[in-house]
Amino acid sequence: MLAQLFFSAAALAGDWQRVFTSATLSVDQRAYPGSALREIRGVARVEASLNALMALLKDAAFNRHWVYRSGGAKILEQNGYRQAYVYGVVDAPWPMQDRDTVVRFDYSQAPDTRVITITITNCPDFLPRDPRYVRVPDFGGHWQLRPLADGWVEVTYQVFGDPGGWIPVWVANYAAVTSVTRTLQALPDVVGRYRDATSVYVLEPGPILGYSAPHRASVAPVFANASRTPFTTDNFNSQDRLNADSQKP
């Protein structure tokens, strides 16, 4: 699969097979029912607050600087803090055509464990297709943030998808593993940008869970880079890529 894609997490069939491991990251794959493509799951341990991780995941403008092969992302529509429709571009390696995606993110947090789940649902018809890109026909998945002791968080990124068009199966599966691995490897290097982030909608683990006291919450902007004007892919490619380039660290 070509980079950045946020694929579907189907809790179905097949034993997980380890394909990568390091001190703080493991990546597994398994067969997906009815498809030759693989479902991928990456699990990383990251030293960060839940607020910092959520701020990073919501920052569409910064997406291309850490999500593997991301060509940029932009919020199309948001419904409060807990839901947003997001457009993204995947920079496919030559000679393959670039892909684009439209997905819906839904956020929830368990009040007892403080575990955060962000589900990703495919919405390919939410935005008219652009002939310059292959619209990804099938993907979805989830992020899960589970607080651990001493300021660490277990970050799970589980995905499945079909990149569309013609791509050899072995290339798609290799790219899917690479995408999840590289994205989770990059995450610890960039989350520090958001160390001071706070939101009334994100609860840090408190004394009831045996952790330190939660951060003092303050109202923070909802999904970053939200558009107040009608979105077109022309506007995205001409302006947002320039904006993203200017924000490189």
Question: Could you say what each language-model-derived stretch is?
Answer:
Residues 1-3:
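Bacterial N-terminal signal peptides that target proteins for export
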Residues 12-249:
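Eukaryotic helix-grip
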